[in-house]
């Protein structure tokens, strides 16, 4: 009887060990602190819009992030509504160009996962966006371009002009109607080819190609892997604040730093051509 009980105990223990799936090693690359009241689960795809600290209640610059194929995140230099795009490598970028004061750049992504933001004129409806210590009213005069992504994963927002006769119902940013925790996302933007689309799962950001959002060794925000790029500083610990902005740990301030015709996004300032921004989460809709 004693041996039978010992055998059963051993069997149950082995079953428990088999069922246990330890977290990926990179998932432990998180900041030591967390955002108070932050949401770490958001399974519906959403995008990002760059909001510089120069916003006023009458003028809003929302650069929607784009992503190129390598996963990098970039933002272009133009003052107009634009969703962030992503190029193939996962990088996120924002392009540079001067335009009217009311802006919204949607982050796009290129094939490598980099994130970029380019400049395009877009029309948005008047909506209210809550940002820490201030409420911003958007009254943009152009159509919102959704975040795009190229093969390397970089995130970009492409440069394109939109006619002033654009139909609002087809291209706009507007308050979203979401149940429960999805209420944290305040606005919507039109989704287009290359638009950066991400989900938040247990504090981990995942793009539409399954790559992991991380802060890499040079402090840049981009998508790679899995696993994330070697030497990555953070690969977990992401959340959406109660104001609807993206945060890593207890920090929701990022920096867009000029790199040629694009801005790359970082979690820290890396030089003189860097400006602090918030990354506003936006719901993505087909227009």
Curated annotation (Swiss-Prot):
**Post-translation: what modifications?**
Covalently linked to beta-1,3-glucan of the inner cell wall layer via an alkali-sensitive ester linkage between the gamma-carboxyl group of glutamic acids, arising from specific glutamines within the PIR1/2/3 repeats, and hydroxyl groups of glucoses of beta-1,3-glucan chains.
Q: Where is the signal peptide?
A: 1-21
Induction text = Cell cycle-regulated. Expression peaks during mitosis.
Q: Give a GO biological-process term.
A: fungal-type cell wall organization
Per the record's keyword annotation, is Glycoprotein included, yes or no?
no
| GO cellular component assignments | extracellular region; fungal-type cell wall; fungal-type vacuole
| Start and stop residues of the PIR1/2/3 repeats | 62-80, 81-99, 104-122, 144-162
- Marked site: Covalent attachment to cell wall glycan: 72, 91, 114, 154
Q: Which UniProt keywords apply?
A: Cell wall, Cleavage on pair of basic residues, Repeat, Secreted, Signal
Localization per record: Secreted, Cell wall
Question: Which residues of the precursor form the propeptide?
Answer: 22-62
Q: Which cysteines are joined by disulfide bonds?
A: none
Q: Name one Pfam family in it.
A: PIR
| Gene Ontology molecular function, alphabetical | structural constituent of cell wall
Q: Does the keyword Repeat apply?
A: yes
Positions bearing the site annotation: Cleavage: 62-63
Q: Report the sequence similarity comment from the record.
A: Belongs to the PIR protein family.
Instruction: Please explain the role this protein plays, according to its UniProt record.
Output: Component of the outer cell wall layer. May be involved in meiosis and sporulation.
Q: What is known of its domains?
A: The PIR1/2/3 repeats are required for the covalent linkage to the cell wall. Their number varies among different strains of S.cerevisiae.
This chain belongs to which protein, by name?
Cell wall protein PIR5
Whichever gene encodes this chain, its name is: PIR5
């Amino acid at each position: 009887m004693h041996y039978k009980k010992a055998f059963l105990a051993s069997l149950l223990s082995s079953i428990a060990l088999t069922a246990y799936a330890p977290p990926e090693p990179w998932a432990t690359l998180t900041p030591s602190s967390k955002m108070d009241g932050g949401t770490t689960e958001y399974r519906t795809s959403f995008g990002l819009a760059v909001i510089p600290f120069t916003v006023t209640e009458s003028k809003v610059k929302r650069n929607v992030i784009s992503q190129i194929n390598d996963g990098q995140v970039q933002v272009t230099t133009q003052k107009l509504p634009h969703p962030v795009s992503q190029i193939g490598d996962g990088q996120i970028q924002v392009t540079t160009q001067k335009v009217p004061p009311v802006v919204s750049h949607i982050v796009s992504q290129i094939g490598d996962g980099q994130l970029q933001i380019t400049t395009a004129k877009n029309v948005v409806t008047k909506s209210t966006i809550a940002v820490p210590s201030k409420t911003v009213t958007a009254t943009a005069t152009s159509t919102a371009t959704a975040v795009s992504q190229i093969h390397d994963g970089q995130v970009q927002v492409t440069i394109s002009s939109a006619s002033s006769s654009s139909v609002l119902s087809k291209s706009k940013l507007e308050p979203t109607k979401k149940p429960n925790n999805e209420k944290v996302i305040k606005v919507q933007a039109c989704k287009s080819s290359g638009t950066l689309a991400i989900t938040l799962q247990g504090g981990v950001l995942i793009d539409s190609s399954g790559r992991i959002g991380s802060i890499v060794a040079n402090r840049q925000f981009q998508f790679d892997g899995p696993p994330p790029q070697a030497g990555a500083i953070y690969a977990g610990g992401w959340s959406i604040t109660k104001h609807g902005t993206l945060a890593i740990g207890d920090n929701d301030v990022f920096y867009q730093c000029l790199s040629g015709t694009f801005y790359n996004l970082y979690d820290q300032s890396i030089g003189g051509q860097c400006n602090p921004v918030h990354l506003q989460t936006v719901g993505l809709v087909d227009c």
